[in-house]
């Protein structure tokens, strides 16, 4: 596809954090049956004058599930290079990720679409868009207490999270900022057997295991030379592995420092400072909570354990915690690396003490869940990886 064929398509506005700092162009719009609605959208498609907006006036906006689009690449940013490398590592068609490169709004529609990378070459990135209106983040579920009274739903979501985490781990990818705001759930499919409805996002924060400290400039040249081979559905795994060996994550220095400090009392659960496990903030553009930053392979298990605990609390506990108290209590659990479990000797009843003001009885209904969480939160020397946890405790 050349410049002349691209120029006939309309631009779509992107939010400011688009990693390519360029623009999308529409190739065609698809309805539910994948029939072509309109191969070419005129220049007035996004006009404020609704009389000129044939697409919206034809009420086709409700038919869009996916859009095939082309991203014209002039210069790949560092963020884009990281995401592209992760996608090459795990495969462009992974069902375990809500895909990358930011959001954009379709003007006039109450929709938020997120592009999915299909393939790439030296000049173009071919993508399709996923309608994010059908998803909600795990953070939304926890805050809205959508799982209230439904341990079945809680366990289903956790199975999906474990399946996605296993997929990442088996491809030697560590998601460094895994938290409820980075996990998307396909709401309409909850309760089904399709575990791919739970997906991870923010792939630019992933770290490829075994990566070196080579520069992004060398990565850029190596990625460009191999991109044509990765544009097909079945990527050349050998080429991808070679590219990934050259991958440089900006957080490598932090990760190396963490490894040097593994002998201290805090072990690999967190590092002190802004990018620490204890770091919590609501100041980013999506208002996501970031309690911890994953720094090694089996720390992913620890992170999933905290997520499991949050989801369980939102399901079984009636009390709504003040936000600061809730965050501080989670921070203490992360810092200590364990749950505070005690037994009432008079009644021989076990309790989980979330903080000084809130204790939760460990009934037969949730004792297995608590046991699994304790396994995920144990000391790093004995804590299982996601793969080990699934094999040893779930089968």
UniProtKB/Swiss-Prot annotation:
**Domain annotation Protein kinase: ranges:** 9-395
Kindly indicate whether the keyword Cytoplasm belongs to this entry: no
Q: Which PROSITE patterns match?
A: PROTEIN_KINASE_DOM (PS50011)
- The organism's superkingdom is given as Eukaryota
Annotated region described as Disordered, given as residue ranges: 213-266
Q: What family name appears in the similarity comment? A: Belongs to the protein kinase superfamily. Ser/Thr protein kinase family.
Which residues does the annotation say bind ATP? 15-23, 54
Query: What name does the UniProt record give this protein?
Result: Probable inactive serine/threonine-protein kinase DDB_G0293746
Please report the organism this UniProt entry assigns to the protein: Dictyostelium discoideum (Social amoeba)
Q: Which InterPro entries match?
A: Kinase-like_dom_sf, Prot_kinase_dom
* UniProt entry keywords in alphabetical sequence: ATP-binding, Nucleotide-binding
